[in-house]
Amino acid sequence: MKERLQQLQQEALEKIEQANDLKALNDVRVAYLGKKGPITEVLRGMGALSPEERPIMGALVNDVREAIQQALEAKQATLEQAEVEKKLAAEAIDVTLPGRPIRRGNHHPLTRVIEEIEDLFIGMGYTIAEGPEVEQDYYNFEALNLPKGHPARDMQDSFYITEEILLRTHTSPVQARTMEKHQGRGPVKIICPGKVYRRDNDDATHSHQFTQIEGLVVDENIRMSDLKGTLREFARKMFGEDRDIRFRPSFFPFTEPSVEVDVSCFNCGGHGCNVCKGTGWIEILGAGMVHPNVLEMAGFDSKKYTGFAFGMGPERIAMLKYGIDDIRHFYQNDLRFLQQFNRV
Amino acid sequence: MFVSYKWLQEYVDLTGITAKQLADRITKAGIEVESVEVRNKGVQGVVIGHVLEREQHPNADKLSKCLVDIGEGEPVQIICGAPNVAKGQKVAVAKVGAVLPGNFKIKRAKLRGEESNGMICSLQELGVESKLVPKEYADGIFVFPSDAPVGADALELLYLDDEVLELSLTPNRADCLSMIGVAYEVAAILGRSVKLPTIELHENNENVHDYISVRVDAQEDNPLYAGRIVKNVKIGPSPLWMQARLMAAGIRPHNNVVDITNYILLEYGQPLHAFDYDRLGSNEIVVRRAKKGETIVTLDDVERTLTEEHLVITNGKEPVALAGVMGGANSEVCDETVNVFIEAAYFNGATIRQAVKDHGLRSESSTRFEKGIDPARTKEALDRAAALMAEYAGGEVVGGVVEANTLQLKDVVVTITLDRINRVLGTTITKEEVAGILTNLQFTFTEDNGTFTITVPSRRRDIAIEEDIIEEVARLYGYDHLPATLPIGEANPGKLTPYQAKRRKVRRYLEDAGLFQAITYSLTNEAKATMFALETAEPIRLALPMSEERSVLRQSLVPHLLEAASYNRARQVENVALYEIGSVYLANGENELPNEKERLAGVLTGVWHAHLWQGEKKAVDFYVVKGILDGLFALLGLENRVEYKQAKREHLHPGRTAEILLDHKTIGFVGQLHPNVQKQFDLKETYVFELDLEALLNVEVDDIRYTAIPRFPSITRDIALVVDEHVVAGELQKAIIEAGGELLKDVSIFDVYKGDRLPEGKKSIAFSLRYYDPERTLTDEEVTNVHEQVIKAVEQQFGATLRG
């Protein structure tokens, strides 16, 4: 009997080994461990054994069953694994094929520049003031110390609708309106982005419609050094931490003193290159201390209050920053242009 | 303003400072020097030669054979092609070995068999611009005065060894439209003194009043008119140094009398005019406004018709000059002129500007009057001109000055404290430093305990208030020394307004949904101005448009977005999805500001989604655009307050257009472009929308309130309803929601069918209804009850039947 059992174990293990798939393996299971299988048969024959032999033989039968069972399970796991692998192999895809595209548009480059500037100044405690694009002559010129007859307000340079109404030529009227709303009480701390219009022929460097961002701070004890510190802060955040700025004296009717503001070249770091035309500096802003006439006209006591104002052109900044060579690109809305600004 | 470095040295000592260094210093102090032009274009070895003999070249009609003394060794033979070369002339000779502009080297040569040892040069050949060469030498060589020393450096005599600074002047610095003004500025920067020209005027004992009288009838336009008579002048060339300086400053020399007036204009900034006294036609000068329709032929031989807005100089009867702009041809100085009347006047800038504008005529004179001259120097300039005419035109100055003078010159006095200067600038400048700067500016001042009382010289008409003085101090102190600080004072938090914040979110949403932001022009033509407009008003027209295409303010953003789409399509970019946020302008009546309303518009055309290798391709259709808008309304929390209503609008497809309502008020539209408009813009199937952004963003929306996450299962039932084909899904859905009551949580449409399996004129719409009660699990029975009510409602309202 013992030999028979050992032989059965031997046979079963061989068949398990040979089984190629789960079905074949199951057949082996049924054949050897099933109720009609040879091991069950051996068990049945145990009645003929002596009481001493019976437990020994019983244990042996269990060992054999155990061994076959284990072999079956091991084989089953192997076969299942193989099956899964086969299935996965069949499911392989070409990962280099293109993915399902996500459609994504983006900001216009001018908005990109404007929002960046807005956020910089919001971080410094400014709010954003907006105003009408069709303006009264008073706010566009007179309130800004450009009385009637001043050469800078020539009919030829502005789009007038009537004698008293025109398309604003700068965003400064928003400053005048905002100051007026404050009724002579500071502080005023605003930046004003927006569209402006001048009577220019459109070419690579001129556009009859363009954008401006201006800033205004009015309070007691505002100093010109505050203007310098503020703009230096702006230049560093906008163009890089190692930027510097310089003031050059200039003239604007609404500020006194007036300056042009240069930023050290962000392309070459100030050594001189074609972006800064070899000077190491790039003109970015016009600025100055608010002219006392402008303060007074808006209802502020110019003996008590001082202020600074600055203005810049998002087109120019975008052109410098991105190397754009023609201002008309901003208004043609060619997707091949717009799409280039679709990432961080 | 062109400033000759050599000439400037007449007035201020420039020792130890190069033209380039000077330019940098001037720029830093406030006047931008745009360029420093080196006048020598690489010329070497050109000297003054004396033409001793000149004869016809034996083998060439157009060439001359000259024997020229060049101041070294034997005279040399030079072949010259200039038609005006003649015996006895002093000329510029490029010697053998000399170099002319363009690195052109002069060699010994044989021309038609005759030896030539150098070249006699025209001014152009020495690098002078043609427009500056005196007319008589325009086509030949330049003839120097007979006293020009043989062998001397011709470049030096012609100021071609000079450098010229081009100043870009801001309108407030008209004082620097003169050499003397520039000298004051340079002296202030360098801390040096100014040498003014000395005037040696010898008058004869006649009285100018016996020759001429002056009357000004328009005193506001002309507060000061002064004149002198210079008798017996001999018209001829002006001295070489004067011609050379004029050319350096960009003015072509003419003759001694005209050159002197131009020279004084440059030196003093005072425009002068020289009349031929004998051709004036009377003995009086009357300055008045022109009569309407009156005419004058100006020096440029153009007849100009005048109006009452123009100021004229007359001889009592007819105009002899358009005041401050240009003289008349009738009284022009010519070669035969003997007696000259010199005018030195102060005209009102605005009056002159009007004439310049109306006649499109800007001159060196008018520019200075427009920007404002120094009236305190008018008569000095007149004296200097008369003295120079006596000296260089052989004239005799008649005694006295005729003048009409109502000018009231008042000293401008500004008082300012040191403390105020430092408070405005944020500096710690000392009293001594301020005093030093004012001294260098040659401002007269007194100082008492930190208070400066400053008398501003009349040449600096731009300085009138404290801030002007602060600027003078700041720019000469140097902005580089200004500290960088930040404002002290109460700090307000900066932030966007709710509207601005929402608008940014709208932009970002649309971009993430696949649209690109466009910015188009606000000005358009009359036809496009009102196309597609949500609200229309009278078109707002520019008074002086530059073109018809940009003459009227837009009332809708759509037309220019269509142009952008068309622009792209013409460049093979067929798939376009653009949006724009911008203003439209609705008139409010004459002299009222229009209503500016912010709109959101978009244009979509071409393929919306393509993933070709997986067989996906979807063109833009109405529902693509509607889906984007639905997402937008959901973003703004308005999805349950917005409705779409089938609509007909001009320029849009009559069957594929919806009006969009917010709280039952129309706020926009979405639709397919009408084929006719499509063709007009050269587009394929295209969809557009426009919304009243202000209505969308200003409407009150509830804050987000948390509701409990469902804890009980929901039950879903589907129904397919067969209705007449004109019944719209939206209405059906509304009825279902109403009938479903509280338990019905979601209704979605999952199928729409029209075709063979339904009777003619019918369609089927399949809805999926989800029922849910947050408090408990619904029973089948409860749901069935409600569901049956729903079915009953649509049966009654729409005659709907359940599809079997």
Curated annotation (Swiss-Prot), chain A:
UniProt xrefs under Gene3D superfamilies: Bira Bifunctional Protein, Domain 2
Note accompanying the cofactor annotation: Binds 2 magnesium ions per tetramer.
Broad class of where this protein is predominantly found: cytoplasm
GO terms of molecular function: ATP binding; catalytic activity, acting on a protein; magnesium ion binding; phenylalanine-tRNA ligase activity; transferase activity; tRNA binding
Alphabetically ordered keywords of this record: Aminoacyl-tRNA synthetase, ATP-binding, Cytoplasm, Ligase, Magnesium, Metal-binding, Nucleotide-binding, Protein biosynthesis
Residue pairs linked by disulfide bridges in the UniProt entry: none
Protein name: Phenylalanine--tRNA ligase alpha subunit
Lineage: Bacteria, Bacillati, Bacillota, Bacilli, Bacillales
